[in-house]
Each structure stands twice: as C-alpha cells, then as structure tokens.
Amino acid sequence: MNITIVDHPLVQHKLGLLREADTSTMKFRQLTQELARLLAYEATRDFELESVTIDGWCGKIDVKQIKGKKVTVVPILRAGIGMLDGVLDLVPSAKISVVGLARNEETLEPVSYFEKFVGNLDERIAIIIDPMLATGGSLVATIDLLKRNGCKHIKAVVMVAAPEGVKIVNDAHPDVQIYAASLDSHLNEHGYIIPGLGDAGDKIFGTKQA
C-alpha cells in the first residue's frame, strides 16, 4: 500500500486522546490541529530545496529555501477545515484551495457541491487534508478534480485510514502518497472506520452525531 504511517510517539499519543468517546468539542478540535501539524511535518519532508543568498546580520550568506511555487492546502469540506490551521502553522504562505464533497449515506458515493482552486496548480504541490480516509471516494474525487485542473504533484494527509479506502485511492492514483497516523482495521457496514474516531466532522464542529 502506498501509505506512510507516522509512528511518532507524539502522533500516537494525540491519536489515542482523539479516540476517546467523551472528548469535548474544544479538545477534539485542538488535538486535530496538533495532529495535522505533526503529520504535515512528515508530508513535507521531501520538499525540494534550493540555495539562495540573503543579507544576514554579518553580511551575505547562503541559506536553503523551498524551491519553486509554494504549496496549496486543499481541505475537503467540512471536516478538513479542522486540520487547516495546524497545516498553516507550518506553511503559513500556502494558498488555500477548497473542495466541498458530501457523502450519500446510502450509496457512500461523494457528491460535489463546491470547488475553488488557486491559480498555477500545475506549478504547485497540493496537500489534501481530511481527517478520515474511509471508503476513499472523496479523496479520489478530489484528486480527480485537482488533476483535471492541471495539478501534477499531490499528497494526502489524513488522521485515520481504512485499508479499503487506501486500496481504492492507490488503484485510482498510484502516484499520490498518503500520510496517516493510523491504518485502522476495517470499515463497518455503514462505511465508518473501525475503531476510527466516530464522525470527525460532527466532533470538530460540535454538531449532533447520529
């Protein structure tokens, strides 16, 4: 499977706290941002650098900077918004693209209702963020949209993934690397990840869970 599990002690500790059933909205939101920051750190590890000359306090010096166009972060609405601030803490100059996809609870297929992409996607690295990679439909649809708009370099950062969803994404887009805190056991009959986190969107936004 084309997936990187970030097995850092801080990542695993925060994931464990997120899994608690009685975690408050405030705490869940805070932990989501913290975990997103740590996962994004790993996802940006292979960014290409270039040397540039700057004016330092002691004169001109050579330093390293990320080469080429900056990143676009792509939250999948609505739950992906909960991870956005954590990623922007690391790459504050990143442009933000947005994809709105809702899951049909009967067919489990994604339905697009909003798309807004920044310019020059062909020159940017896109980092898709979504707390859960369950069936894989939303992630595949988002990657499809990005590629259709010219994006060539795409990564996906999720907190928890199911094997079924990872396979769907790998089969459709083998060039896209997935980063996750955990590869969980399976999907249940309703398409939810087991053990998972529950409904991450409801927990982040404080809305009623079914």
From Swiss-Prot:
Pfam families: UPRTase. InterPro entries: PRibTrfase_dom, PRTase-like, Upp_B, UPRTase/APRTase, Ura_phspho_trans. Pathway: Pyrimidine metabolism; UMP biosynthesis via salvage pathway; UMP from uracil: step 1/1. It comes from the Bacteria. Uracil binds at residues 193, 198-200. GO terms for biological process: UMP salvage; uracil salvage. Its cofactor is Mg(2+). Catalyzes the conversion of uracil and 5-phospho-alpha-D-ribose 1-diphosphate (PRPP) to UMP and diphosphate. This is Uracil phosphoribosyltransferase. It comes from Chromobacterium violaceum (strain ATCC 12472 / DSM 30191 / JCM 1249 / CCUG 213 / NBRC 12614 / NCIMB 9131 / NCTC 9757 / MK).
